[in-house]
Amino acid sequence: MSEMEQQPIFKIALGIEYDGSKYYGWQRQNEVRSVQEKLEKALSQVANEPITVFCAGRTDAGVHGTGQVVHFETRAQRKDAAWTLGVNANLPGDIAVRWVKHVPADFHARFSATARRYRYVIYNHRLRPAVLSHGVTHFHQPLDAERMQRAAQCLLGENDFTSFRAVQCQSRTPWRNVMHINVTRYGAYVVVDIKANAFVHHMVRNIVGSLMEVGAGNQPESWMAELLAAKDRTLAAATAKAEGLYLVSVDYPAHYDLPVLPMGPLFLAD
């Protein structure tokens, strides 16, 4: 057995924040920029060996994360500061490690997760934004957030989300359990906050697209329940844009004792 093989293997979890506007999504792909590729490159430089990461949720092109969780295995023995400050020094400015935690061998960023939470930020104003143009979705028609909130409550619990599932979704089942969904106005911003055990492809953006139709008065509040019951994607509204969507937190069993930080994004309180 070589000296390298005799060294212990460490399993490490990281909290990751990123602005997804310049990336073709989380997942590593040939010849395009991905968050995973940039993170693995930075980790490999610090570890001085090739590193592969596994994430809690693979976000699409243009989608952001303030609470993404990843894990990786390494034989490199480093101080926590190396996995935070050291890795951040090797990352582009729009990706950052927020925390580090050594985890037991049975931990998996995706399969150990019990819930994911997303926030979708709509800038509801007649005129488009400039500074936050890649971090919010602009919708110029006035939205009634209270109407959207009432309409959304039919989505709670375990349901078949075929009407809000992308045609190309590869999940074996359209059934998901929504634990909460809240629509709140903060001045010119309307935020849709949704937590579920997992999500089918484009589920949040498809729900938001339809909720905006309700909020704008183009559809009745009862429309969301009708869409859910219909199990037909063609009846729902267009998919909302990627730039307003953030993966803000991932839940794990308490015994893993992972850090819990403010979710954000931007000005949003927890």
From Swiss-Prot:
E.C. code: 5.4.99.12
Pfam families membership: PseudoU_synth_1
Source domain of life: Bacteria
BP GO terms, sorted: tRNA pseudouridine synthesis
Catalytic activity: uridine(38/39/40) in tRNA = pseudouridine(38/39/40) in tRNA
Positions of the UniProt region annotated as RNA binding: 107-111
GO molecular function ontology, one term from the record: RNA binding
Annotated site location: Interaction with tRNA: 58, 78, 110, 126, 139
Region of interest: Interaction with tRNA: 168-172
Active site positions: 60
Protein residues bound to substrate: 118
Keywords: Isomerase, tRNA processing
Enzyme class name: isomerase
InterPro entries hit by this protein: PsdUridine_synth_cat_dom_sf, PsdUridine_synth_TruA, PsdUridine_synth_TruA_a/b_dom, PsdUridine_synth_TruA_C, TruA/RsuA/RluB/E/F_N
Subunit field text: Homodimer.
NCBIfam families given in the database record: hisT_truA
HAMAP family: TruA
UniProt function note: Formation of pseudouridine at positions 38, 39 and 40 in the anticodon stem and loop of transfer RNAs.
Record-stated family: Belongs to the tRNA pseudouridine synthase TruA family.
Protein name as catalogued: tRNA pseudouridine synthase A
Source species taxonomy: Bacteria, Pseudomonadati, Pseudomonadota, Gammaproteobacteria, Enterobacterales
